[in-house]
Swiss-Prot record:
InterPro entries, per the entry: UPF0319
Keywords per UniProt: Signal
Record has Signal as a keyword: yes
Transmembrane segment boundaries: none
Full protein name: UPF0319 protein SO_1816
Length: 226
Protein backbone atom coordinates (compact mmCIF):
# COMPACT_ATOMS: atom_id res chain seq x y z
CA UNK A 1 0.00 0.00 0.00
CA UNK A 2 2.88 2.37 0.66
CA UNK A 3 3.83 2.34 -3.00
CA UNK A 4 0.39 3.33 -4.24
CA UNK A 5 0.72 7.02 -3.44
CA UNK A 6 4.06 7.57 -5.21
CA UNK A 7 2.86 5.61 -8.26
CA UNK A 8 -0.41 7.53 -8.32
CA UNK A 9 1.46 10.80 -8.05
CA UNK A 10 3.76 9.75 -10.89
CA UNK A 11 0.79 8.87 -13.08
CA UNK A 12 -0.74 12.27 -12.39
CA UNK A 13 2.51 13.98 -13.33
CA UNK A 14 2.84 11.94 -16.51
CA UNK A 15 -0.76 12.64 -17.39
CA UNK A 16 -0.25 16.37 -16.88
CA UNK A 17 2.84 16.34 -19.08
CA UNK A 18 1.11 14.42 -21.86
CA UNK A 19 -1.68 16.97 -22.25
CA UNK A 20 0.59 20.02 -22.23
CA UNK A 21 1.32 19.85 -25.95
CA UNK A 22 -0.80 21.48 -28.64
CA UNK A 23 -1.57 20.28 -32.16
CA UNK A 24 -1.49 22.21 -35.43
CA UNK A 25 -3.79 20.64 -38.02
CA UNK A 26 -3.78 21.26 -41.78
CA UNK A 27 -6.05 20.08 -44.66
CA UNK A 28 -4.96 17.59 -47.33
CA UNK A 29 -4.20 20.43 -49.74
CA UNK A 30 -1.41 21.74 -47.49
CA UNK A 31 1.93 20.11 -46.70
CA UNK A 32 4.35 20.54 -43.79
CA UNK A 33 7.96 21.16 -44.84
CA UNK A 34 9.83 22.13 -41.69
CA UNK A 35 9.41 22.91 -38.00
CA UNK A 36 11.85 25.07 -36.04
CA UNK A 37 14.80 24.35 -38.31
CA UNK A 38 14.11 20.65 -38.88
CA UNK A 39 12.57 18.96 -41.90
CA UNK A 40 9.17 17.37 -41.50
CA UNK A 41 8.89 13.98 -43.16
CA UNK A 42 5.83 14.29 -45.39
CA UNK A 43 4.98 13.84 -49.06
CA UNK A 44 2.11 13.49 -51.50
CA UNK A 45 2.25 9.76 -50.77
CA UNK A 46 2.31 10.11 -46.98
CA UNK A 47 0.41 13.19 -45.87
CA UNK A 48 1.06 14.43 -42.34
CA UNK A 49 -2.04 16.26 -41.12
CA UNK A 50 -0.91 17.43 -37.67
CA UNK A 51 2.15 18.51 -35.71
CA UNK A 52 2.56 18.35 -31.95
CA UNK A 53 3.82 21.64 -30.53
CA UNK A 54 5.10 22.37 -27.04
CA UNK A 55 4.26 25.71 -25.39
CA UNK A 56 6.32 28.57 -26.83
CA UNK A 57 6.92 30.20 -30.20
CA UNK A 58 7.31 27.96 -33.24
CA UNK A 59 8.08 28.54 -36.92
CA UNK A 60 6.42 26.13 -39.33
CA UNK A 61 7.07 26.04 -43.09
CA UNK A 62 3.99 24.94 -45.06
CA UNK A 63 3.13 24.69 -48.75
CA UNK A 64 -0.17 24.58 -50.65
CA UNK A 65 -0.55 21.99 -53.40
CA UNK A 66 -3.57 20.79 -55.34
CA UNK A 67 -4.54 18.88 -58.47
CA UNK A 68 -6.66 20.92 -60.90
CA UNK A 69 -8.24 20.55 -64.31
CA UNK A 70 -5.97 21.63 -67.15
CA UNK A 71 -7.20 24.65 -69.11
CA UNK A 72 -6.27 23.20 -72.50
CA UNK A 73 -7.13 19.51 -72.17
CA UNK A 74 -9.28 16.99 -70.32
CA UNK A 75 -6.38 15.96 -68.10
CA UNK A 76 -5.29 17.29 -64.73
CA UNK A 77 -2.19 19.10 -63.57
CA UNK A 78 -0.54 19.89 -60.25
CA UNK A 79 -0.28 23.40 -58.87
CA UNK A 80 1.66 24.36 -55.78
CA UNK A 81 2.75 27.48 -53.98
CA UNK A 82 6.14 28.42 -52.68
CA UNK A 83 6.48 27.74 -48.95
CA UNK A 84 5.09 30.17 -46.40
CA UNK A 85 6.23 30.34 -42.80
CA UNK A 86 3.77 30.45 -39.92
CA UNK A 87 5.16 31.87 -36.68
CA UNK A 88 2.81 30.61 -33.99
CA UNK A 89 2.77 31.35 -30.27
CA UNK A 90 1.48 28.29 -28.42
CA UNK A 91 0.14 29.14 -24.97
CA UNK A 92 -1.57 25.91 -23.97
CA UNK A 93 -2.74 22.45 -25.01
CA UNK A 94 -4.96 23.82 -27.78
CA UNK A 95 -6.06 22.38 -31.10
CA UNK A 96 -5.01 24.82 -33.84
CA UNK A 97 -6.43 24.63 -37.36
CA UNK A 98 -5.03 26.18 -40.54
CA UNK A 99 -7.17 26.72 -43.61
CA UNK A 100 -7.50 29.02 -46.59
CA UNK A 101 -8.85 32.45 -45.69
CA UNK A 102 -11.71 32.01 -48.17
CA UNK A 103 -12.91 28.83 -46.44
CA UNK A 104 -12.54 25.07 -46.68
CA UNK A 105 -12.93 25.06 -50.46
CA UNK A 106 -10.44 27.01 -52.59
CA UNK A 107 -12.41 28.09 -55.66
CA UNK A 108 -9.43 29.11 -57.80
CA UNK A 109 -6.41 26.98 -56.79
CA UNK A 110 -4.04 28.50 -59.37
CA UNK A 111 -4.79 32.04 -58.21
CA UNK A 112 -4.59 30.99 -54.57
CA UNK A 113 -1.20 29.32 -55.10
CA UNK A 114 0.24 32.60 -56.37
CA UNK A 115 -0.56 34.32 -53.08
CA UNK A 116 -1.91 31.90 -50.45
CA UNK A 117 -4.00 33.62 -47.80
CA UNK A 118 -4.47 31.47 -44.71
CA UNK A 119 -5.95 31.84 -41.25
CA UNK A 120 -5.36 29.97 -38.00
CA UNK A 121 -8.12 29.26 -35.51
CA UNK A 122 -8.46 27.40 -32.24
CA UNK A 123 -11.01 24.68 -31.48
CA UNK A 124 -12.11 26.58 -28.38
CA UNK A 125 -12.56 29.81 -30.41
CA UNK A 126 -9.80 31.51 -28.43
CA UNK A 127 -7.44 34.13 -29.87
CA UNK A 128 -4.51 32.83 -31.89
CA UNK A 129 -1.27 34.81 -31.97
CA UNK A 130 0.48 34.15 -35.26
CA UNK A 131 2.16 35.71 -38.26
CA UNK A 132 2.45 34.42 -41.84
CA UNK A 133 5.38 35.25 -44.11
CA UNK A 134 5.51 34.05 -47.73
CA UNK A 135 8.72 33.11 -49.54
CA UNK A 136 9.73 32.69 -53.19
CA UNK A 137 11.53 29.37 -52.70
CA UNK A 138 10.80 26.97 -55.55
CA UNK A 139 11.32 23.26 -56.01
CA UNK A 140 10.86 20.58 -58.63
CA UNK A 141 8.04 18.15 -57.99
CA UNK A 142 8.49 15.00 -55.90
CA UNK A 143 8.12 12.86 -59.03
CA UNK A 144 10.71 14.92 -60.89
CA UNK A 145 13.26 14.54 -58.10
CA UNK A 146 12.51 10.84 -57.88
CA UNK A 147 13.29 10.15 -61.54
CA UNK A 148 15.69 12.88 -62.64
CA UNK A 149 19.39 13.01 -62.03
CA UNK A 150 19.70 16.77 -61.77
CA UNK A 151 20.25 18.69 -58.56
CA UNK A 152 16.87 20.09 -57.56
CA UNK A 153 16.41 22.82 -55.02
CA UNK A 154 15.85 21.25 -51.61
CA UNK A 155 12.83 23.25 -50.49
CA UNK A 156 12.44 21.33 -47.25
CA UNK A 157 16.07 21.98 -46.38
CA UNK A 158 15.82 25.65 -47.30
CA UNK A 159 12.57 25.94 -45.36
CA UNK A 160 14.19 24.23 -42.40
CA UNK A 161 16.95 26.83 -42.47
CA UNK A 162 14.38 29.60 -42.70
CA UNK A 163 12.39 28.28 -39.76
CA UNK A 164 15.55 27.88 -37.72
CA UNK A 165 16.47 31.57 -37.94
CA UNK A 166 15.17 33.72 -35.11
CA UNK A 167 12.99 36.56 -36.37
CA UNK A 168 12.02 39.55 -34.26
CA UNK A 169 8.33 39.73 -35.06
CA UNK A 170 5.33 40.53 -32.91
CA UNK A 171 2.67 37.82 -33.37
CA UNK A 172 -0.68 39.18 -34.45
CA UNK A 173 -4.20 37.72 -34.57
CA UNK A 174 -4.29 38.24 -38.33
CA UNK A 175 -1.87 37.07 -40.98
CA UNK A 176 0.62 39.30 -42.80
CA UNK A 177 1.22 38.26 -46.38
CA UNK A 178 4.04 38.80 -48.86
CA UNK A 179 3.87 38.10 -52.60
CA UNK A 180 4.48 34.46 -53.47
CA UNK A 181 5.28 32.75 -56.75
CA UNK A 182 3.66 29.45 -57.75
CA UNK A 183 5.11 26.53 -59.64
CA UNK A 184 2.80 24.39 -61.78
CA UNK A 185 4.01 21.17 -63.32
CA UNK A 186 3.65 20.46 -67.00
CA UNK A 187 0.36 18.81 -67.97
CA UNK A 188 0.60 15.02 -68.19
CA UNK A 189 1.05 13.54 -71.63
CA UNK A 190 -1.80 11.70 -73.28
CA UNK A 191 -1.83 7.92 -73.80
CA UNK A 192 -0.55 8.18 -77.37
CA UNK A 193 2.64 9.88 -76.16
CA UNK A 194 3.13 7.96 -72.92
CA UNK A 195 5.40 5.36 -74.50
CA UNK A 196 7.95 7.94 -75.64
CA UNK A 197 7.72 10.06 -72.50
CA UNK A 198 10.32 10.20 -69.77
CA UNK A 199 9.69 8.25 -66.52
CA UNK A 200 8.33 11.32 -64.72
CA UNK A 201 5.69 11.97 -67.38
CA UNK A 202 4.73 8.31 -67.59
CA UNK A 203 4.30 7.99 -63.84
CA UNK A 204 2.30 11.20 -63.66
CA UNK A 205 0.06 10.10 -66.53
CA UNK A 206 -0.79 6.70 -65.06
CA UNK A 207 -1.30 8.19 -61.58
CA UNK A 208 -3.96 10.48 -62.98
CA UNK A 209 -5.63 7.57 -64.80
CA UNK A 210 -5.68 5.25 -61.77
CA UNK A 211 -8.65 4.78 -59.46
CA UNK A 212 -8.53 5.39 -55.70
CA UNK A 213 -7.75 1.74 -54.83
CA UNK A 214 -4.87 1.55 -57.30
CA UNK A 215 -3.44 4.85 -56.06
CA UNK A 216 -3.44 3.62 -52.45
CA UNK A 217 -1.70 0.40 -53.47
CA UNK A 218 0.91 2.37 -55.40
CA UNK A 219 1.42 4.77 -52.47
CA UNK A 220 2.09 1.82 -50.14
CA UNK A 221 4.62 0.41 -52.59
CA UNK A 222 6.30 3.79 -53.21
CA UNK A 223 6.69 4.45 -49.48
CA UNK A 224 8.35 1.06 -49.03
CA UNK A 225 10.88 2.01 -51.72
CA UNK A 226 11.97 5.29 -50.08
Amino acid sequence: MKSLLPISSLLVLLGSASVSAADLNIPMSFEYLALDGKKVESSVFNHKSSLELAPGTHKVAIRYHEMVEDDFSDSQTFVKSSPFIVTLEVDGDHQYYLQAAEGKVVKKPKVFAQNPQVVLTRADKGQVNYQVTNTNIEEESFVSRLFSGNQAVDVSGTAATATGVAVAATPAPTSAQVAVSATATTSPTDASKATGANPQQMLQYWWLQADEKTRKEFMSWAISQL
